[in-house]
Amino acid sequence: MKRKKTVLHHILAEKQKFEKRKEGGSMSAKDEFGTTKYVIYAEFEANGIVERPDVVGAIFGQTEGLLGDDLDLRELQKTGRIGRIRVEVHAKAGKTYGTITVPSSLDRVETAILAAALETIDRVGPAEAKIKVLRIEDVRATKRKYIIERAKEILETLMEQEIPETQELTEEVKKAVRAKELIEYGPEKLPAGPHVPFSDSIIVVEGRADVLNLLKHGIKNAIAVEGTSVPETIIKLSKERIVTAFTDGDRGGELILKELLQVADVDYVARAPEGKEVEELTKKEIVKALRSKVPAEQVITEIFYKGRNFYEVIKEKERAKNGREEKVREVKPPAPAPAPAPAPKPIEKPEPKEREEKIVKPIQQPRPSELDEFGEFIEKVKSSKDSMALLLDKDKSVIAEIPVRELTNQLKERKDVYAVVFNGVITQRLIDTVSESGVKYLVGARKYNVVRRPVNLKIVTFAE
């Protein structure tokens, strides 16, 4: 009776275990064995047909009292030092074959003794049987392998997640700084960069996002129109500052540009690459677009009156620039012949003369003596990539070479300036400032919206 109860107990236990395995599928070593240190793997062969409960009963029954109370399987299982014994069986040709798995939390020696005890079992149920231990596996080694592999997976996941988070954090901080730099300008509270209140030149863009993108790339003198109608603040600023309109490369950008040119005093026009918006441009694209800016008069004439495309004008401008550079290279070699002196000045002088004569003669005969006087200085500022102004005294000697943005301040401080030669636009505001400083000659790239000419100041442009 006692044997029947034991067998039934093991049958139920094995059934529950089978159901759990069915539900859980394949489990990791950690789930299977818990705190197990070793696993005994054995195989058996019985000369007859036996079932799983017969094998389990034989293991418990035939080892009982064999190894003493300390290594009794039932006691060890109660205390958790031996796990559930797993048995797999299959019958073939009147014999039964199978495997036995015994999880153990005992030490190495006790586990080996227990494994050897299994091989003493010689009968399973009614049939003779033979059990052979195949190996004892160190579960801790398996766990170590599992830990290493799992740690690799966790680290890879962590690295994949951490890098974007770091980038997002950095971007958030930068956005916060840029937003702090953003100011509200004028009664309309227009979004603007921190340099707009005092900068000599400003960049007019369409919206707040455009100003933020320019701030991101270090351009701090931009101000936004914020809408389709041009605010009064922009109109006032355009009369006092050098204004560059920088609009999107789409239909909306063209409409805003038309309105700006009608109501504001715009000096230059720059556009984002065709189909792109200013807010999405990279630093390289922004710099390229601003360097390719076109004078406002040319935009009005070529685009709005003649109906040409803005980007065609830009390409033509680049081709013309490259053509001029090639022409200079061709003309330059014969120039030294009439001037044997080693100094570079005589070589440079004939070159602008020759070029100016070709352009000017068919149009008119304006002040050739003035061009001769300032030809050398005109060539110098024209060849400069940056905005540059030369301040000359009565002897035509350069007393200062400064950026154009510092011209107004320098003229207020100096009283010995006879002439100013620079590569910028001659505006009415600049004419008034120069005239008040006692300057006699003002030489610039071109004139724009000049309505008053002081009698004590001679104005010359490069084209004249």
From Swiss-Prot:
Mg(2+) 1 binds at residues 206, 248. Its EC number is 2.7.7.101. Gene3D superfamilies: 3.40.1360.10. Residues 322-332, 346-359 have a biased composition (Basic and acidic residues). InterPro entries: DnaG_primase, Primase_DnaG_arc, TOPRIM_DnaG/twinkle, TOPRIM_dom. Residues 333-345 have a biased composition (Pro residues). Pfam families: Toprim_4. Its cofactor is Mg(2+). Keywords: DNA replication, DNA-directed RNA polymerase, Exosome, Magnesium, Metal-binding, Nucleotidyltransferase, Primosome, Transcription, Transferase. GO terms for biological process: DNA replication, synthesis of primer. It catalyses: ssDNA + n NTP = ssDNA/pppN(pN)n-1 hybrid + (n-1) diphosphate. Forms a ternary complex with MCM helicase and DNA. Component of the archaeal exosome complex. Belongs to the archaeal DnaG primase family. NCBIfam families: PRK04031.1-1. RNA polymerase that catalyzes the synthesis of short RNA molecules used as primers for DNA polymerase during DNA replication. Also part of the exosome, which is a complex involved in RNA degradation. Acts as a poly(A)-binding protein that enhances the interaction between heteromeric, adenine-rich transcripts and the exosome. This is DNA primase DnaG. The gene is dnaG.
